[in-house]
């Protein structure tokens, strides 16, 4: 457990396209002072106010997690937030050119590479953590998510798809920087070929491609020539998403998060439920 807050050594920029709008997008990561937190700002909108990376600022959870509202909304923050969280970075300003964080390769790997290229700086301020004191659970139909006390940071994510290629998969592991790098960071976002036309008609997935998505064909086979990176790559990516979504609690947590058939909305509702119950957690200093 890192005792002191961290930021990055210098600014670094990543460019690509937005997975939903398909337009060019870039993210410039800049160092920030201790106790700043993670701030997002639309650099393409004059005088736009920074938005705190916090569950209270979530604007939408349809296929991705969005922060802010109206014309200054920033979509698809989860892969970047997962990398930031896993690397133990507490303070950062993220300038976004366009309405989306670039999808890059559909994972957190490129964000980690960018941070590695500029280094991490330890700051003269202690880290704070959310320690889970009791179980908090949310349900939606046959899906659920819950926090419970645990001496560490653990994710137990289970998915269950009708598609036989995916089926029922579970990832259960304590997640620290090393685990995230090795087991989760390269797991790709995924989708079904049968959904493509519907998504396009809705103005979504316009930037999706085999370069940034794992695609399941109509015959339930992998369309990508390189196949799966892990036999359970699907649940690993869902866990990556959960790491990013839960980072919007505003502080790293000590406890276990479990979910069944979860997603961005359920993840965010679980965080909101936790933070709304002051008896369910305490804030501690490292």
Swiss-Prot record:
Catalytic activity of the protein: a UDP-3-O-[(3R)-3-hydroxyacyl]-N-acetyl-alpha-D-glucosamine + H2O = a UDP-3-O-[(3R)-3-hydroxyacyl]-alpha-D-glucosamine + acetate
EC number of this enzyme: 3.5.1.108
One Gene Ontology term of the molecular function aspect: UDP-3-O-acyl-N-acetylglucosamine deacetylase activity
Pfam families recorded: LpxC
Pathway(s) this gene product operates in, as recorded in its UniProt entry: Glycolipid biosynthesis; lipid IV(A) biosynthesis; lipid IV(A) from (3R)-3-hydroxytetradecanoyl-[acyl-carrier-protein] and UDP-N-acetyl-alpha-D-glucosamine: step 2/6
Domain of life: Bacteria
GO biological process, one term: lipid A biosynthetic process
Ubl conjugation found in the keyword field: no
Annotated catalytic residues: 264
Keyword annotations: Hydrolase, Lipid A biosynthesis, Lipid biosynthesis, Lipid metabolism, Metal-binding, Zinc
Binding-site residues, Zn(2+): 79, 237, 241
GO CC list: membrane
The protein's required cofactors: Zn(2+)
Role: Catalyzes the hydrolysis of UDP-3-O-myristoyl-N-acetylglucosamine to form UDP-3-O-myristoylglucosamine and acetate, the committed step in lipid A biosynthesis.
Family note: Belongs to the LpxC family.
UniProt protein name: UDP-3-O-acyl-N-acetylglucosamine deacetylase
